[in-house]
Amino acid sequence: MIQQETRLKVADNSGARSLLCIRVLGGSKRRSAGIGDVIVASVKEATPGGAVKKGDVVRAVVVRTKKETRREDGSYIRFGENAGVLINSDGSPRGTRIFGPVARELREKGYTRIISLAPEVL
């Protein structure tokens, strides 16, 4: 459950370290984002020499949430942190590596490139 003002870690090597959610995309009344949803965020911390700088406004897809997500079989999955991956306007990841596990719900949402780069899919 990511909403406005939520801080997220960045799970790729795009140069950003942490994000602040500005907006959840997908309708004017949409308040929260889950795994696989796209948000607009501001870069709050960045590594020197990275592709993005502090203060840049970027789009990101949520790959891990602390709030549990219910699956079709009745099981739940949750992670220890909120994390996102920066994406371009066409939905492809901006970084070349993904760090940490990602949820398999991303495959159903069409983010196969993120799935293939991730070291572990839960």
UniProtKB/Swiss-Prot annotation:
Q: Which GO terms describe its molecular function?
A: large ribosomal subunit rRNA binding; structural constituent of ribosome
Name this protein carries in UniProt: Large ribosomal subunit protein uL14
Q: Name one GO biological process term.
A: translation
Kindly give the NCBIfam families that the UniProt entry links to this protein: rplN_bact
Q: Which UniProt keywords apply?
A: Ribonucleoprotein, Ribosomal protein, RNA-binding, rRNA-binding
Q: Which SMART domains does the annotation name?
A: Ribosomal_L14
Complex formation: Part of the 50S ribosomal subunit. Forms a cluster with proteins L3 and L19. In the 70S ribosome, L14 and L19 interact and together make contacts with the 16S rRNA in bridges B5 and B8.
The organism's place on the tree of life at top rank:
Bacteria
Listed InterPro entries: Ribosomal_uL14, Ribosomal_uL14_bac-type, Ribosomal_uL14_CS, Ribosomal_uL14_sf
The UniProt similarity line reads: Belongs to the universal ribosomal protein uL14 family.
User: What is the primary gene name for this protein?
Assistant: rplN
Cellular compartments per GO CC: cytosolic large ribosomal subunit
